[in-house]
Design a protein with these regions (language model features):
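Cell-envelope and extracellular/periplasmic
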Residues: 66-71, 93-106, 115, 122, ...
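Serine-esterase "nucleophile elbow" of acetyl-processing enzymes
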Residues: 1-69, 74-75, 79-88
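Catalytic His-Asp segment of secreted/periplasmic serine-dependent ester chemistry enzymes
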Residues: 137-229
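A short helix->loop->beta-strand "cap" motif at the edges of active sites that frequently abuts
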Residues: 124-129
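Structural recognition of the beta-strand scaffold that forms the well-ordered cores
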Residues: 30-33, 62-67, 91-95, 130-134, ...
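Metal-dependent catalytic neighborhoods of phosphoester/phosphodiester hydrolases
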Residues: 43, 103-109, 143-144
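N-terminal cationic-hydrophobic initiation segments that often serve targeting/anchoring roles
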Residues: 55, 84, 118, 122-123, ...
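Charged helix-capping and loop-helix junction motifs
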Residues: 107-117, 153-159
Length: 229
């Protein structure tokens, strides 16, 4: 329940302030979410920038990246007025869920926070295109404890089903599918066997992609956003 959640919603305030100090680029595709986005071009990690990987077809800039750390769905909701609204995006790409479980949020709380963000966005920006990113398969989910692994798989399946149900009711919302992308598995035939997610495209923590991982994600996101590029 919510009264058991003790996440400090301002623990990532420094990251938010840093984005606020950058020039506001209105009318772009705004990426908003957790560390899958944060590391995509962060100087700290030395990866190629997201705005280099995802560009307009004429080569001009297309995206603004507002990924921040271990953010939860509630933090994304909390910071929406500061990190989304001033940029007046024409499309919003949001990634959440991955950190919610370890801070005590259940699936419906995560989904409710996400739905509020999407509702606010379409209220603030009529005609905006909305994209929700599936949680991505990763080697860290594979453990020697069957109960833990089965629980993680069940949670991801439940979340994906909720996303698909939501998207069916809202034509302005599309799901960017990652869970069954062949490029993330050892062979295309391994899709669906989550013990065979490629390990070579992740850093040592087995959670976050390395540059080879982002080399795969770039085309996936470009394809999903093609009509806007």
């Amino acid at each position: 329940m919510l009264f058991n959640i003790e996440k400090n919603l301002k623990s990532l305030e420094d990251s938010v302030v840093a984005y606020e100090q950058e020039p506001i680029e209105k009318g772009k595709i705004l990426f908003y979410g957790h560390s899958l986005f944060t590391r995509w071009g962060s100087p700290k990690y030395g990866y190629r920038r997201m705005d280099e990987d995802i560009r307009m077809k004429d080569g001009s800039l297309a995206v603004v990246n507002h990924g921040f750390g271990t953010s939860t769905s509630e933090e994304l909701l909390y910071y929406y007025p500061r990190l989304v609204r001033p940029w007046e995006p024409r499309a919003l790409v949001i990634a959440t869920l991955a950190n919610d479980g370890m801070y005590g949020y259940d699936m419906m709380q995560s989904m409710q926070n996400l739905v509020k963000i999407l509702h606010w966005a379409r209220t603030d920006f009529p005609g905006i295109k909305l994209f929700v990113v599936e949680d991505h398969p990763r080697p860290s989910l594979i453990t020697s404890v069957p109960q833990k692994w089965n629980g993680a798989l069940h949670k991801s399946n439940e979340y994906r089903q909720l996303l698909q149900a939501y998207a069916q009711l809202h034509p302005d919302t599309k799901i960017i599918e990652l869970w069954n992308q062949p490029e993330l598995f050892e062979t295309p035939e391994d899709v669906g066997d989550y013990t065979k997610v490629r390990k070579d495209i992740f850093v040592e923590d087995k959670v976050h992609p390395n540059q080879a991982g982002y080399d795969i994600l770039g085309p996936i996101f470009r394809k999903a956003l093609d009509e806007l590029l």
